[in-house]
């Protein structure tokens, strides 16, 4: 029988509930327990797929093609498990499902209400993950903050789960803020007390309180929080700011959080094995080398829009004992006059995924700079499409070459809408999504990187390489090194006579892990290191 852990948040949003939940998942897994994770988001959107990155950050894509919250990326990276669409549930999905059932007549004769119909649907999603994975523990993060109107049905549902499953099989962890006053440096517990009071008023008594704080939490404050919030002192956990999110599991282990949780849920206490994780954190703290990559995008003011790319670069850097510093370059500011000033000195250039025509010409100019100056380049999704456009214009001589996404009347549509997308009007959930096989061509840089002729990667796109230009562009030197097994879709392109110029239609960043960096990022960092060493000599 699965045990259930629910992670809620109080006082303010963006406290790091996701990292806390993911870290606990890592600790439990390190003791031999199987773990599944999920996130409940109280917004009415079906998924974040159509939201602006400025509203939501990155959209993380699962193997089965769900567009999900960026916290799922943290979950996958920490517990090293591929999650599914069942791991991200929004209020929109819940209401959609209930209304659909009502229209079909599933509730015939009943007045459909928040309780029990909405709450039953939420509970079913919790249990579904446990059944799907057949795991020892399900960790569910509740998005938002206690007290939000949108969160109430979710909190009511998890209260009911505790009754149905037995209190001994359910644990509530509340993540809260303990702020300090700048003039005195005094830590204040009152916001935490009020947050827990709010939680208890709807029938949930937290079993553990994780206190986000910039300063150490003195023993007397722990005792005060324990007294006023009705938990044991050892269940008041200090969660201070750290340099790297990968230190958080070690900080929680130091305070015996995993032991407390395992004892509370009456789970077997296996031997903890965090040796490789500790080694990773140690290498991350003490790099032997440094490289700088210019990330050219249009959402560079919000780094969370590219969080999986950032983490994949970190993983690859640690593999090479190298700190990868990111130079955030706004694509809209890149042009012939500014390109040298903005990109000079970068050891590598990366153009990530994106949509729309804003900043496109800047990205194309940055790619030209990488190609002409033999700077290692990695293009992801849109970064591949822009690389094809740049090559078509400046090497193949196709003046005005473009994607029909940006210029429907381009004389040379080297990137075009996928045929199966042409009759689709709706935006949400209609792209080519999820994992697909890619055949890697022997004798190419991609094959050298993967060392495998068939790989599986995650996608999120509507547009593709236009095969009418395949023969022309390859005759001019473009190398197609990855194809769909039926050879219809171009998945990877590269250039010869270049230290590292590789671009993919898929998103390799979604499959990178701290202890297993993605090979494309690993070799990209290696190429940057080699270039830096050669230049120094």
UniProtKB/Swiss-Prot annotation:
The Glutamine amidotransferase type-1 domain covers 292-534
Report residues binding L-glutamine.
Answer: 54, 354, 382-385, 405, 462
Q: In which pathway does it act?
A: Pyrimidine metabolism; CTP biosynthesis via de novo pathway; CTP from UDP: step 2/2
Which InterPro entries does its entry note? Class_I_gatase-like, CTP_synthase, CTP_synthase_N, GATASE, GATase1_CTP_Synthase, P-loop_NTPase
Q: What positions does UniProt annotate as the active site of this protein?
A: 381 (nucleophile), 507, 509
Q: Which residues bind Mg(2+)?
A: 71, 141
Asked whether the UniProt record includes Magnesium among its keywords, one would answer: yes
Annotated UTP binding sites: 13, 188-193, 224
One GO BP annotation is: 'de novo' CTP biosynthetic process
What this protein is called in its record is CTP synthase
**What organism does the UniProt record list as the source?**
Caldanaerobacter subterraneus subsp. tengcongensis (strain DSM 15242 / JCM 11007 / NBRC 100824 / MB4) (Thermoanaerobacter tengcongensis)
Q: Which gene encodes it?
A: pyrG
